[in-house]
Amino acid sequence: MPRTLGNGFIHVSKLDACIEVDRPLDTYSPGSLTDIEKTFGKHVAGLIDDGACLQLGIGGIPDAVLDFLHDRKDIGIHTEMFSDGLLELMDRGVVTGDRKTFHPGKIIAGFTIGSEKLYDYIHDNALIEFHPSDYVNDPFNIARNDNMVAINSALQVDLTGQVCADSIGAYIYSGFGGQVDFMRGAAMSKGGIPVTAMPATAVGGEVSRIVPMLNEGAGVVTSRADVHYVVTEYGVAQLHGKCVRDRAKALVEIAAPQFQESLLRAAHKRRLFGPLI
């Protein structure tokens, strides 16, 4: 078990019982990036400047973004989850935290899962601090980082900008985690950028993730009032401050080409563009 620094200690006097366990820690090994992941990773990376402070999760989307940041400088990290994808950027000197305006020079995280290498890396590492989620995920603490870029995934986005990230229809797929906290914190940050990133399709290209309306019973994690940037392998849609008509147009443009015509007709039917002609 790695010994992590920060605010994660409990004095032994607070424990009623202590049981030693010697089984190996659970690990997670990142897979190879797909061409689609590499493409939208490049689009997201284009929104990240030198000195930005990042929040990322785990899996193909964050790893794809990190793969295109090797030429950046003084990147900071304030994130709910600390994962393997960050290790290479730290070794390359890309992640320094030197320009952070909140906990400068430190990586702030809430929890971690990854490889044995990751666990060895964070053990007694004074550059990495773990804190309770009510501190890490506090939108006002997140906003204290200038140029905060929050990158979160989605299952569906409708043509008005509502983001579903936790359910497939009425069936719960995962927890919503800290997505709303970080999207709002990044929005309040000076120079901050909230990003929703996802592949344009699912089920091998048979289903569009950009939809006229969310599936019946689907949960809205990031509301249309909180959404800013939506990214797929087909481009970047900037939605914040735009009317519903312009949002729908921007989202159709980053949908998979085989679904664009049907999405346009659905937008007309919903009167997002005006009457159906």
Say what each PLM segment does.
Residues 1-277:
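Conserved phosphate- and dinucleotide-binding cores of soluble alpha/beta proteins
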